């Protein structure tokens, strides 16, 4: 019989035996739901979320931690360098395309995060070493100064530690930064060595003497400049040369009379422990060198003192004595004056000589030259209008006033006395005192009529003033001074001298008496030029006069009406100056400022 086509029949039992294919059947057991859940979660990635460490034996836990700690100590993690540190441009190179950043409110929970991963970033040790190297000694000194609460006290303390002496023992204090002197003691803290060495050369063009004492990053300078300088100028110069801040520098003048201060600087020079340029200052030589002390014992010269007082226009004994004593620090003759036991006599003789010189100088000048000398400041302004407006306010004809003033300055007979009369508080005294003060005139008072010398100040004046003349004063003038107002020579009684033949200078008189209507003064009236001031002087809310007349007002007035007053001056020389400056001693022997 032929074979059947197709698949051979397979016995049912063979199929069950699995000889041709495998059949897996589910094995069902009587397991509880809890057991099934535990078995299903054995291989889960979120296992051990619940902390069941309490069930572990405590001894095993401590041993495990100890092993981990020892393992960590042996592990050397290679620190990762940031890409930006390797190359500034390498961080811009990417292989993978950039993806848009995801917005996240919070960081990941860290479930799949490896806590053992090291995020250590290597710190460049070379950069730290470089920053530490920049902190040199000069910068450390500067930082310690700038960080202190009291900078000056810190600098003074550092100075004493460096140089072994207090800065205040070497210097005297100038309260003002504008006070000038050629001698200065300068100290700077926290200065670089190269700048300090360069300063030695740069300062030589500014000074006559330079002494530089160096200690570490600090420097002490004793300087005598070629010209006088104030503290502001010195600080600007030193800050630019040393590239320093003003807080690092102290600048004061030396104690010119302190032997200890002079010996400190002199000792540094002779021991060759400092840099020196130029000749030794005179104040150091005077206090340290014996030969110089013997040579400085000069005899006092009165002529030099007189010349000094004349040049500075000192005519009072008190001003001469005080100012010449202050001048002793700079002038040997003034120092000899202080060392003398006859200072009072020298002062009196000096003032007497200066007054005689000044008196003769004034007498040798014409009125035009004297007015021009008083107008030293040739200012062109509009202040002269104050005088014109005040005269107009008082109802005075300005043209008549100019004519009277012209005759007044020329000392025309019977026209050399101007009288200003009127009620009180009209500005008569203010107007006249300003004019007399400007022309450096003298004031006499009838209160001294009991003295026969009450007219003596008029011999030393180009113009005189008699303020507030009463009726009794007019009777005296009418009785004794008619010929003096005529411009004639009269006899004047001078204290400790014989009677002097002199002429009365142009006089200005203020009074409340109307001399133009008083018949008792009929013979004196023709010798007077009178102006009436009837209006009360206007005042401001602060009780100040609205008309402000000053020396500048009179200067502008005379410059404005110079030709109208027929005043003349020599065009060949400066106005108000003599042909040759007065000299009562050899100029080369006087030390000038």
UniProtKB/Swiss-Prot annotation:
Location of the motif Nuclear export signal: 86-95
Keyword list, A-Z: ATP-binding, DNA replication, DNA-binding, Early protein, Helicase, Host nucleus, Hydrolase, Isomerase, Isopeptide bond, Nucleotide-binding, Phosphoprotein, Ubl conjugation
Pfam families, A to Z: PPV_E1_C, PPV_E1_DBD, PPV_E1_N
Phosphoserine modifications at: 87
Main location: host cell
Keyword Hydrolase part of the UniProt annotation: yes
Keyword Zinc assigned: no
Stretches for region DNA-binding region: 134-297
Motif mapping: Nuclear localization signal: 72-74
Cross-link (Glycyl lysine isopeptide (Lys-Gly) (interchain with G-Cter in SUMO)): 503
Reactions catalysed, as given in the entry: Couples ATP hydrolysis with the unwinding of duplex DNA by translocating in the 3'-5' direction; ATP + H2O = ADP + phosphate + H(+)
GO cellular component terms listed in the entry, alphabetical order: host cell nucleus
Entry binding sites for ATP: 422-429
Biological role stated in the UniProt entry: ATP-dependent DNA 3'-5' helicase required for initiation of viral DNA replication. It forms a complex with the viral E2 protein. The E1-E2 complex binds to the replication origin which contains binding sites for both proteins. During the initial step, a dimer of E1 interacts with a dimer of protein E2 leading to a complex that binds the viral origin of replication with high specificity. Then, a second dimer of E1 displaces the E2 dimer in an ATP-dependent manner to form the E1 tetramer.
Protein name (Swiss-Prot/TrEMBL): Replication protein E1
Species lineage: Viruses, Monodnaviria, Shotokuvirae, Cossaviricota, Papovaviricetes
């Amino acid at each position: 019989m032929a074979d059947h086509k197709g698949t051979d029949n397979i016995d049912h039992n063979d199929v069950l035996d699995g000889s041709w294919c495998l059949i897996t059947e589910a094995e069902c057991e009587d397991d509880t739901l809890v057991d099934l859940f535990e078995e299903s979660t054995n291989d889960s990635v979120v296992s051990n979320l619940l902390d069941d460490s309490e069930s572990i034996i405590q001894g095993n836990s401590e041993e495990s931690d100890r092993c981990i700690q020892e393992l960590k100590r042996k592990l050397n993690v290679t620190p990762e360098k940031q890409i930006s540190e390797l190359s500034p441009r390498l961080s811009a190179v990417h292989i993978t395309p950039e993806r848009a950043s995801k917005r996240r409110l919070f960081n990941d929970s860290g479930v799949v995060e490896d806590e053992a991963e090291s995020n250590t970033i290597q710190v460049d040790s070379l950069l730290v070493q470089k920053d530490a190297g920049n902190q040199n000694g000069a910068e450390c000194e500067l930082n310690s100064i700038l960080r202190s609460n009291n900078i000056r006290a810190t600098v003074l303390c550092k100075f004493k530690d460096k140089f072994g002496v207090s800065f205040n023992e070497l210097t005297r204090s100038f309260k003002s930064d504008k006070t000038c002197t050629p001698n200065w003691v300068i100290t700077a803290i926290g200065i670089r060595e190269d700048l300090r060495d360069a300063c030695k050369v740069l300062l030589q063009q500014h000074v006559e003497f330079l002494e530089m004492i160096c200690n570490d990053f600090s420097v002490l300078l004793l300087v005598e400049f070629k010209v006088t300088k104030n503290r502001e100028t010195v600080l600007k110069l030193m800050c630019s040369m040393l590239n320093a801040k003003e807080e690092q520098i102290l600048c004061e003048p030396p104690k010119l009379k302190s032997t200890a201060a002079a010996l400190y600087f002199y000792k540094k020079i002779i021991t060759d422990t400092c840099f020196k340029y130029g000749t030794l200052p005179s104040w150091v030589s005077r206090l340290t060198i014996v030969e110089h002390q013997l040579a400085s014992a000069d005899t006092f010269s009165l002529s030099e003192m007189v010349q000094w007082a004349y040049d500075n226009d000192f005519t009072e004994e008190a001003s001469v004595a005080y100012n010449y004593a202050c001048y002793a620090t700079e002038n040997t003759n003034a120092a000899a004056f202080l060392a003398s036991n006859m200072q009072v006599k020298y002062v009196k003789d000096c003032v007497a000589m200066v007054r005689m010189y000044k008196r003769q100088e004034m007498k040798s000048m014409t009125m035009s030259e004297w007015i021009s000398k008083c107008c030293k400041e040739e200012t062109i302004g509009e202040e002269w209008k104050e005088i014109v407006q005040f005269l107009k306010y008082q109802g005075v004809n300005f043209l008549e006033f100019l004519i009277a003033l012209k005759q007044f300055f020329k000392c025309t007979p019977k026209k050399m006395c101007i009288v200003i009369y009127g009620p009180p508080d009209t500005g008569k005294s203010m107007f006249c005192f300003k004019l007399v003060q400007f022309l450096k005139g003298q004031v006499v008072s009838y209160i001294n009529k009991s003295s026969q010398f009450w007219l003596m100040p008029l011999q030393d004046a180009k113009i005189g003033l008699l303020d507030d003349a009463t009726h009794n004063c007019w009777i005296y003038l009418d009785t004794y001074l008619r010929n003096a107002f005529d411009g004639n020579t009269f006899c004047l009684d001078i204290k400790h001298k014989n009677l002097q033949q002199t002429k009365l200078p142009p006089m200005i008189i203020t009074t409340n008496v109307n001399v133009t209507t008083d018949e008792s003064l009929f013979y004196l009236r023709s010798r007077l030029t009178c102006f009436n001031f009837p209006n009360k002087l206007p005042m401001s809310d602060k009780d100040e006069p609205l008309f402000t007349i000053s020396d500048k007002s009179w200067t502008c007035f005379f410059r404005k009406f110079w030709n109208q007053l027929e005043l003349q001056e020599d065009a060949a020389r400066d106005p108000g100056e003599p042909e040759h400056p007065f000299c009562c001693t050899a100029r080369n022997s006087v030390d000038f400022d």
